[in-house]
Amino acid sequence: MESYLVDTYQGIPYTAAVQVDLVEKDLLPASLTIWFPLFQANTPPAVLLDQLKTLTITTLYAASQSGPILKVNASAQGAAMSVLPKKFEVNATVALDEYSKLEFDKLTVCEVKTVYLTTMKPYGMVSKFVSSAKPVGKKTHDLIALCDFMDLEKNTPVTIPAFIKSVSIKESESATVEAAISSEADQALTQAKIAPYAGLIMIMTMNNPKGIFKKLGAGTQVIVELGAYVQAESISKICKTWSHQGTRYVLKSR
């Protein structure tokens, strides 16, 4: 079993984001990825990660109003595991690599292949951008963050677009507002990091946010969900080799 620690916050308590790569113990084993609901931990990350290696997990492929899901049951040994969520559901669209190998409504025991632990700031200091492109009231534009990374292994640039929020702006003022937002963002954003959770996430740490970012609060870590952005086997490599170079902001008319 492999294990990886992505450390974005050094302190206790911290918010733990745990993701696990699994293979079903089945005649036609499917590969899948599940992630636990965020939880707050007081155990040193190295100890928590070590106890996560004792995980036993079963999954059940099911349906819901929002689409296919995986129902997850988990157990593990160790005192730190008392705070670990034991029953939860995850989006099957992100979790599953191979739909054709899954049996509907069948409880399946899984073998844990890889455990990822990402540490973030404590509750109250972690926020999330909701990645929704649905119309919101009379909003006219979407604020998009273009996060630039460098793949240090291949020495190639990678840009990830992330939806931030919807805003109301007159078309004649959009260029001026976009410039102002860019200036505010330069002061607000200090760093971004890729981490394995819900497929893949980007963690942006805010510092002295102003204007459109001021509600986020100084020092807040913001999660941007990227979903099934890459194949599961590439996640650990990306977390190690992608370096944040900078973030640009653009306004896109709805």
From Swiss-Prot:
Q: Which GO terms describe its biological process?
A: virion assembly
Q: Which residues carry this modification: Phosphothreonine?
A: 205
Annotated compartments: Virion; Host cytoplasm; Host nucleus; Host cell membrane
Entry superkingdom:
Viruses
Q: Please give the coiled-coil regions recorded for this protein.
A: none
Entry keyword annotation includes Magnesium: no
Per UniProt, the keywords (alphabetical) are: Host cell membrane, Host cytoplasm, Host membrane, Host nucleus, Host-virus interaction, Membrane, Phosphoprotein, Viral matrix protein, Virion
**Region: Interaction with M2-1, residue numbers:** 1-110
Topology class, membrane: Peripheral membrane protein
| Sequence motif Nuclear export signal, residues | 194-206
Q: Which GO terms describe its cellular component?
A: host cell cytoplasm; host cell nucleus; host cell plasma membrane; membrane; viral envelope
Q: Where is this region: Nuclear targeting and binding to host importin KPNB1?
A: 110-183
Q: How is it modified after translation?
A: Phosphorylation is important for oligomerization.
- One GO MF term attached to the UniProt entry: structural constituent of virion
Per the record, the major location class is virion
What the record says about family reads:
Belongs to the pneumovirinae M protein family.
Q: What does this protein do?
A: Plays a crucial role in virus assembly into filaments and budding. Early in infection, localizes in the nucleus where it may inhibit host cell transcription. Later in infection, traffics to the cytoplasm through the action of host CRM1 to associate with inclusion bodies, the site of viral transcription and replication. During virus assembly and budding, acts as a bridge between the nucleocapsid and the lipid bilayer.
The record describes its quaternary structure and partners as: Forms dimers. Forms higher-order oligomers. Interacts with glycoprotein G (via N-terminus). Interacts with protein M2-1; this interaction directs the matrix protein localization to cytoplasmic inclusions comprising viral proteins L, N, P, and M2-1 and mediates the matrix protein association with the nucleocapsid.
Protein name listed in UniProt: Matrix protein
Q: Which organism is it from?
A: Human metapneumovirus (strain CAN97-83) (HMPV)
Query: Top-down, what is the taxonomic lineage of the species of origin?
Result: Viruses, Riboviria, Orthornavirae, Negarnaviricota, Haploviricotina
